[in-house]
From Swiss-Prot:
Name under which the protein is recorded: Keratinocyte proline-rich protein
GO (cellular component) term, any one: cytoplasm
Source organism per UniProt: Homo sapiens
InterPro entries named in the record: Keratinocyte_PR (IPR052881)
Modified residues (Phosphoserine): S394
Compartments (UniProt record): Cytoplasm
Highest taxon of source: Eukaryota
Tissue spec. comment: Expressed in the upper layer of epidermis and psoriasis (at protein level). Expressed in the upper layer of epidermis and psoriasis.
Keyword Phosphoprotein listed: yes
Signal peptide positions (record): none
Taxonomic classification: Eukaryota, Metazoa, Chordata, Craniata, Vertebrata
Length: 579
């Protein structure tokens, strides 16, 4: 029935094509639609016994197209359909690509010929022409050449090897989210059986656990490969759980330095993992240097700083800034309850106050710049906001200043030989105003008041603080903080520490010049000392503070000075450090 016959285009065309259905993927724009395509000099329609109408195919003389041949079995015979046109006649069996070359389609069709289509996509370059195809009786096959658009194929990114863990179906599934501060705000439901160590559930008990188990979302103190409670203690590097702001106290005496051995542990905000790998159906776990595994490899998030101060309740610091860590939890092995989020690492700028700890006075707005300006570093987020009126009594209030002193302040401060002063420093030393306003000093000053230049005197030391007392009021004892401030940056208060340079003439003071002993939490809030027994490093006589005096920071209890506050006068240089 299906005799071999040759059908050619009746028009002298270089290329012919037929109209037929396409079977591209459902994403293809050609899917389930009649597409008009062309193939180089080919006849596409083969008919078997039944009569079929004349097919009209639109031809675009185009660039060479890739043609693919479809074989359709037609009952029992095979038809060789050779397309002949006024081009180089060349017979190609099955697949081939030729520009303006005839190709042979080997068509076989089964009983009721089902059309199969292969695709070639070409770019139109000339106007569309028409050619007619003659059909013999019997079934026919419409073959269309179209190449499915490549853009429909979106390659899936290769999965990155990540650490995986698998949460128990109904045990300790996280309910909550990771905030931008990398604090897991939420709870693990039924935190009795945690991510199990072997086959047993370890409850969160006050003892050290030999194998890590995540529980009750409390701050945890990691010791080697175990997580243990540290509610009243400080979090060390790498511990996980409700991260509050942790600062790296390099050499301050507020907190003891963190243990050296804990530096080796990976610090990550990912939940603590079981130490053994999860099911073999997942990707193999990659041990992170022999330490407990996480869902993702623990990031060395440098800004997770630690101190060993007792933790304070996060009362009013809801919007914290400062050190953050990066979280990446993405893996088919991870439970879906832990949303893959990314917590950007934000290196805290030096000396920037946290805006969430309440309105605080602009420290340094009332001080003549005794020290070079260093970028503000963030106050600890867990430090409750302190206002000037909330801070302890300042020495000015303990020692009532004489009335005429505030008005005589500009005269002794007139500088006959001005010298460059360091940039403003956010300190809590109430020092120099053009006209001190005693009534307004207890109130917070968020905006620094403009001062008429740096006030220096040709005397051995410039007036650095308000000349409000005929004599400095020695502080009998340091004013204790209401509560220990667990961060390197204490809650700032307006300290009006006496200075030997109060009056028009510097007054040398013996001993500590009436200044109180440094408290570990007030290293940055005290006025600099000057005198024979204090910080007259720039003076030999020690009778006062001169223009070239060096005002180093007080030494902390651990022997380390506040490196972020080491300053000098004209001859000094500013040092800075992260906290």
């Amino acid at each position: 029935m299906c005799d071999q016959q040759q059908i050619q285009c009746r028009l002298p065309l270089q290329q012919c094509c037929v109209k037929g259905p396409s079977f591209c993927s459902s994403q293809s724009p050609f899917a389930q639609s009649q597409v008009v395509v062309q193939a180089p000099c080919e006849m596409q329609i083969v008919d078997c016994p039944a009569s079929c109408p004349v097919q009209v195919c639109q031809v675009s003389d185009q660039a060479p197209c890739q043609s693919q041949t479809t074989q359709v079995k037609c009952q029992s015979k095979t038809k060789q359909v050779k397309g002949q046109a006024q081009c180089q006649s060349k017979t190609t069996q099955v697949k081939g690509q030729a520009a303006s070359q005839s190709q042979t389609s080997s068509v076989q069709s089964q009983a009721p010929c089902q059309s199969e289509v292969s695709y070639v996509q070409c770019e139109a370059s000339q106007p569309v022409q028409t050619c007619f195809v003659e059909c013999a009786p019997v079934c026919y096959t419409e073959t269309c050449y179209v190449e499915c658009p490549v853009q429909n194929y979106v390659p899936c990114p290769a999965p990155q090897p990540v650490q995986m863990y698998r949460g128990r179906p109904a045990v300790c599934q996280p309910q909550g989210r990771f905030s931008t501060q990398c604090q897991y705000q939420g709870s693990y439901s039924s935190c009795g059986p945690q991510f199990q160590s072997r086959a047993t559930c370890n409850n969160y008990t006050p003892q050290f656990q030999l194998r890590p188990s995540y529980s009750s979302c409390f701050p945890q103190y990691r010791s080697r490969t175990s997580f243990s409670p540290c509610v009243p203690q400080c979090q060390t590097q790498g511990s996980y759980g409700s991260f509050t702001e942790q600062h790296r106290s390099r050499s301050t005496s507020r907190c003891l330095p963190p243990p050296r051995r804990l530096q080796l542990f990976p610090r990550s905000c990912s939940p603590p993992r079981r130490f053994e790998p999860c099911s073999s159906s997942y990707l193999p776990l990659r041990p992170s240097e022999g330490f407990p595994n996480y869902c993702t490899p623990p990031r060395r998030s440098e800004p997770i700083y630690n101190s060993r101060c007792p933790r304070r309740p996060i009362s009013s610091c809801s919007q914290r800034r400062g050190p953050k860590c990066r979280i990446e939890i993405s893996s088919p092995c991870c439970p879906r309850q832990v949303p893959p989020q990314r917590c950007p690492v934000e290196i805290p700028p030096i000396r920037r106050r946290s805006q969430s700890c309440g309105p605080q006075p602009s420290w340094g707005a009332s001080c003549p710049e005794l020290r070079p300006h260093v970028e503000p570093r963030p106050l600890p987020s867990f430090c409750p906001p302190r206002r000037l009126d909330q801070c302890p009594e300042s020495p000015l209030q303990r020692c009532p200043p004489p009335a005429p002193r505030p008005r005589l302040r500009p005269e002794p401060c007139i500088s006959l030989e001005p010298r460059p002063r360091p940039l403003p420093r956010q300190l809590s030393e109430p020092c120099l105003y053009p006209e001190p306003l005693p009534a307004l000093r207890p109130t917070p000053r968020p905006v620094p008041l403009p001062r008429p230049g740096q006030c220096e005197i040709p005397e051995p030391r410039p007036c650095l603080q308000p000349c409000e007392h005929p004599e400095p009021c020695p502080r009998p004892e340091p004013i204790p903080l209401p509560a220990p401030c667990p961060s390197p940056e204490p809650c700032r208060e307006t300290w009006r520490s006496p200075s030997p340079c109060w009056g028009p003439n510097p007054v040398p003071y013996p001993g500590d010049l009436g200044c109180h002993e440094s408290s570990p939490h007030r290293l940055d809030t005290e006025a600099p000392y000057c005198g024979p027994s204090s910080y007259n490093q720039g003076q030999e006589s020690g009778a006062g503070c001169g223009p070239g005096d060096v005002f180093p920071e007080r030494r902390g209890q651990d022997g380390h000075g506040d490196q972020g506050n080491a300053f000098a006068g004209v001859k000094g240089e500013a040092k800075s450090a992260y906290f």
